[in-house]
Amino acid sequence: MLRKLFLFLMAVIGTVAMDAQALAPISWTAYGLTFDAPKGILVEEDTEDTFLLNSSRFYISLQSLDSEDMVQEDLNELLKGLADDDGVQEQSPIESFDLKQFHGIWLKGKAEEDPCYYACLMTKDAGSVFYISIIYNRTDDKVVEKMLKSFKMEEEM
């Protein structure tokens, strides 16, 4: 009996662990912007201004921002302002990261009771800036960081 209980618990833990990391590429068609998102997440909106995704564990929002005359040094102030405007509490210091096509920054915090990441990505040619918010529950920060580090843009032909 104890052996069956142990095997059942291991199967449940294994399923939860695999589910937490089950990511698949998804694209915002207006910009050819692709990133890894949780498998099965629903696209609520896919317009030129906004890309919204939703599941029982994640709410992901992407927006294209007016980037005219914006430089990489402007991103920290921009991100902090967006998080403050949305009432994000317990904000972490801003961290930067670098991708093949983007300069990126993020901060962690709480949106009401749920953990969240707020991020900005600027293309390395300084042509586009994207704002990303990911509100989530029942997952590991590493999954969210993996999503943020997976962004890429279709190369122009």
Where are these regions (language model features)?
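Sec-dependent N-terminal signal peptides
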Residues: 4-14
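Sec/Tat signal peptide C-region and signal peptidase I cleavage site
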Residues: 16-22
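Surface-exposed amphipathic alpha-helical segments
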Residues: 21, 32, 38-42, 83, ...
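Short, hydrophobic/aromatic-rich segments at coil-to-beta transitions
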Residues: 22-26, 49-50, 99-108
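Secretory pathway targeting signatures of secreted, lumenal, and periplasmic proteins
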Residues: 31-76, 110, 114
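Short, surface-exposed coil-to-beta transition loops
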Residues: 46-48, 113-120, 131, 143-146
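Short, well-ordered beta-strand elements
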Residues: 62-63, 127-136
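Signature of long, low-cysteine stretches enriched in small and polar/charged residues
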Residues: 79-126
